[in-house]
From Swiss-Prot:
The lineage of its organism: Bacteria, Pseudomonadati, Pseudomonadota, Betaproteobacteria, Neisseriales. One of its GO terms (cellular component) is cytoplasm. Forms a cylinder of 14 subunits composed of two heptameric rings stacked back-to-back. Interacts with the co-chaperonin GroES. InterPro entries: Chaperonin_Cpn60_CS, Cpn60/GroEL, Cpn60/GroEL/TCP-1, GroEL-like_apical_dom_sf, GROEL-like_equatorial_sf, TCP-1-like_intermed_sf. It catalyses: ATP + H2O + a folded polypeptide = ADP + phosphate + an unfolded polypeptide. The gene is groEL. This is Chaperonin GroEL. It comes from Neisseria meningitidis serogroup C / serotype 2a (strain ATCC 700532 / DSM 15464 / FAM18). Belongs to the chaperonin (HSP60) family.
């Protein structure tokens, strides 16, 4: 086991604070409408230019082990805030730096760090409650666009395209961000349910131009096993043929003579059918088949529930207004499912999201909700160069997370104003303990730091602006983008309450742990001797 370097007291705390400051100073320059870029060197390809706090934080590793521990703890603040709210990482970092800097003064002066932390926690709890009270719902498309614009560093185009996407697919819909092919941002919307399985044979194509199989007013047969014997299918096919309507078959697989017969019937025009594989695998496949059944008003034919394919009737089949099947995707538009049943299914999946432990499971469940409740929108980010594309994509993703957070918990005045106004909740907060009261004072001062940094990045004088904002009331604040004072919400400078709340909670949590640290242990790097020179090769014998 390698030897350890153990350090105590003020000396080690100072090193930790140095690490915090190095990371926070790199991140804080990106805050606000006039925040600057950070350029990050990459081992492969061109440099990465970003204004995203968490991206900058993730790149920082320091040589000194103790400084690096401080930096990594603040990195955790940014990452956690990003995981919960998807934005606000720079605000969280600035708050953490401020709480640590203020708190260390009190610790050095001999106050009890544990009581300071308790005071900080009580102050944060009061602020969070106040933020919830002052938050207003974010319902209109205009407000959603404003939140998106602010998060994307005042890029109004980004805000507008996100608002349009949310309008098209609903607030629960899936919105993804991809690289575009042109210079402009584009929005593609897939209405209805889409899953990533295409036709099993190109002979099913009936629209040669689009290379898709389009079915109008079709029946939908859902089966959870393989179909290889055409005899099992014949009774259903005959009933569908009598009804003179097309049929989509979704099964684990369709192969052999069953597939061949369907193709021949299709080519001859006897019966318009298309076969596709069921989406997903294992239990997820069963769940998705059930989703499709509820969406189309059909039943999954499964031997597990005593249903067999040869006894299936038209009542067991789902129906839809139109279904389009491409090489890799199938889209069901306007299923005939019962709205109440669809809502109940969505509520059931939401319940599963609450209890899911892995991010992957949550993401897949969220996709299922979106496919049932709304649709899928794809924002294609356009840019002139690859470097610009990456930077723009970062901002669009941030803005998307921010708008989702705004819809969830409402919005508050942006530009650091909400935190200043929430301080009213601390005026009458007395803990009955001098050291805990000092913890409350630490938070009182720290909540000014985001506004101070926004003003500093815009080239203003932070103290002057903070005093002027404190003289006002309600949503009165400073718009660093235009240099004006006024009602922040009317000027469209909004922050999601969830982002502000998460930033404050995570910053205080990690900063509190730092203040109560009195010993740090790091490995002493071993000085490995250099590799010895390789011996020379022996001389070759004389050649004949």
């Amino acid at each position: 086991m390698a030897a350890k370097d153990v350090q105590f007291g003020n000396e080690v705390r100072q090193k930790m604070v140095n690490g915090v400051n190095i990371l926070a100073n790199a991140v804080r320059v990106t805050l606000g409408p006039k925040g600057r870029n950070v350029v990050v060197d990459r081992a492969f390809g061109g440099p990465h230019i970003t204004k995203d706090g968490v991206t900058v934080a993730k790149e920082i590793e320091l040589k000194d082990k103790f400084e690096n521990m401080g930096a990594q703890m603040v990195k955790e603040v940014a990452s956690k805030t990003n995981d919960v709210a998807g934005d606000g990482t720079t605000t969280a970092t600035v708050l953490a730096q401020s709480i640590v800097a203020e708190g260390m003064k009190y610790v050095t002066a001999g106050m009890n760090p544990t009581d300071l932390k308790r005071g900080i926690d009580k102050a944060v709890a009061a602020l969070v409650e106040e933020l919830k009270n002052i938050a207003k719902p974010c319902d209109t498309s205009k407000e959603i666009a404003q939140v998106g614009s602010i998060s994307a560093n005042s890029d109004e185009q980004v805000g507008a395209i996100i608002a349009e996407a949310m309008e098209k697919v609903g607030k629960e819909g899936v919105i993804t961000v991809e690289d575009g092919k042109s210079l402009e941002n584009e929005l593609d919307v897939v209405e209805g349910m889409q899953f990533d399985r295409g036709y099993l044979s190109p002979y099913f194509i009936n629209d040669a131009e689009k290379q898709i199989a389009g079915l109008d007013n079709p029946f939908v047969l859902l089966f959870d096993k393989k179909i290889s014997n055409i005899r099992d299918l014949l009774p259903v096919l005959e009933q569908v043929a009598k009804a003179s309507r097309p049929l989509l078959i979704i099964a684990e697989d369709v192969e052999g003579e069953a597939l061949a017969t369907l193709v021949v019937n299709n080519i001859r025009g006897i019966l318009k059918t298309v076969a596709v594989k069921a989406p997903g695998f294992g239990d997820r496949r069963k769940a998705m088949l059930q989703d499709i059944a509820i969406l189309t008003g059909g039943t999954v034919i499964s031997e597990e529930v005593g249903l067999s394919l040869e006894k299936a009737t038209l009542d067991d089949l789902g129906q839809a207004k139109r279904i389009e099947i491409g090489k890799e995707n199938t889209t069901i538009i306007d299923g005939f499912g019962d709205a109440a049943q669809i809502e109940a299914r969505v509520a059931e999946i939401r319940q599963q999201i609450e209890t899911a432990t892995s991010d992957y499971d949550k993401e897949k469940l969220q996709e299922r909700v979106a496919k049932l409740a709304g649709g899928v929108a794809v924002i294609k980010v356009g840019a002139a160069t690859e470097v610009e594309m990456k930077e723009k994509k970062d901002r669009v993703e941030d803005a998307l997370h921010a708008t989702r957070a705004a819809v969830e918990e409402g919005v508050v005045a942006g530009g650091g104003v909400a935190l200043l106004r929430a301080r009213a909740a601390l005026e009458n907060l007395h803990t009955g303990n001098a050291d805990q009261d000092a913890g409350v004072q630490i938070v009182l001062r720290a909540v000014e730091s985001p506004l101070r940094q926004i003003v500093a990045n815009a080239g203003g004088e932070p103290s002057v602006v903070v005093n002027k904002v404190l003289e006002g009331k309600g949503n009165y604040g400073y718009n660093a983008g235009s240099g004006e004072y006024g009602d922040m919400i009317e000027m469209g400078v909004l922050d999601p309450a969830k982002v502000t709340r998460s930033a404050l909670q995570h910053a205080a949590s990690i900063a509190g742990l730092m203040l109560t640290t009195d010993c740090m242990i790091a490995e002493i790097p071993e000085d490995k001797p250099a590799m010895p020179d390789m011996g020379g090769m022996g001389g070759m014998g004389g050649m004949m």
